[in-house]
Regions:
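A conserved beta-strand-loop-helix scaffold within acyl/acetyltransferase catalytic domains
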Residues: 1-12, 110-156
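A short, internal acetyl-CoA/4′-phosphopantetheine-binding micro-motif in the GNAT/acyltransferase core
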Residues: 11-25, 149-163
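Acyl-donor-binding surface of acyltransferase catalytic domains
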Residues: 20-83, 166-172, 180-218
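Short, well-ordered alpha-helical scaffold segments within catalytic/effector domains
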Residues: 25, 94-98, 116, 164-168
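Exposed alpha-helical structural elements
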Residues: 27, 49, 96, 114-121
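A broad structural signal for short, well-ordered beta-strand segments within beta-sheet-rich domains
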Residues: 38, 150-152, 178
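Short amphipathic alpha-helix that is part of the acyltransferase structural core
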Residues: 79-112, 221-222
């Protein structure tokens, strides 16, 4: 079993566990006591042996991440076009999209593993192209794309109808260029989930996040 940290989510200690190690692991309390931080493990949803170990040791399932590969034929309904814009690294529009994503990413990750990276460090990892839509002249919704991958979606204050319009226009734009589109959708990310739900697909497996909390995190009821 290996431990490591993630500077983007530095409030947790991450564990990597091989299935061959499962029989040798008795408990995780010594790691909790040593690091005094929650322990986080990523595991394939069909890895029953490892999941059994985690649940037995008070790890909680906090997130399911679905990897999605789709074509236009998978759509539940026809797409409608709308006006969307492209921007690239270095432009003021790109920076605004980065800020929207930074805030949105922090929001949807807060209850799982809070974002601890600075804005500049976060932006340095992003694709250099973003697609966005304005409401009343203000950018409120965007996607970061890299070829046929939708890497990130974010919104600041748009409603569900506006998000549907944006997603429809985004998919129209991408399907005009590519046969296949890829993206990941966490079940804790409502915007990405809305994107996944546009398609008539059945994804059986997911990549799941389990967390064991440090005792100071817990609230006792007297």
């Amino acid at each position: 079993m290996k431990t490591y940290t993630n500077k983007f989510h530095d409030k947790h200690i991450y564990l990597y566990i091989e299935n061959s190690e499962i029989s040798t692991i008795n408990d995780f309390d010594h790691l909790i006591d040593e690091y005094q931080k929650p322990l986080q493990v990523g595991v394939d949803s069909d890895n029953d042996e490892l999941i059994e170990l985690l649940v037995k040791n008070d790890f909680i399932l906090k997130r399911k991440c679905y990897e999605v590969e789709v074509t236009k034929a998978d759509l539940k309904y026809p797409l409608e076009n709308a006006d969307i814009c492209q921007c690239h690294y270095g432009s003021s529009e790109y920076k605004k999209c980065c800020q929207i994503l930074y805030d949105y990413y922090a929001l949807v990750h807060y209850d799982i593993s809070p974002l601890t990276a600075s804005f500049d460090d976060f932006v340095s990892t992003l694709p250099k192209e973003a697609i966005y839509m304005r409401e009343d002249g203000v950018i409120t919704i965007c996607a970061f794309v890299e070829e046929n991958e939708i890497a990130y979606l974010a919104t600041s204050k748009s409603d569900s109808k506006t998000r549907r319009v944006f997603l429809s226009a985004l998919l129209t734009f991408l399907f005009d260029k590519y046969q296949y589109i890829f993206f990941e959708a966490d079940d804790t990310d409502y915007f990405a989930t809305e994107l996944k739900d546009i398609f008539d697909i059945n994804i059986r497996n997911s990549y799941d996040t389990y967390i064991k909390y440090y005792k100071k995190h817990e609230t006792s009821i007297e």
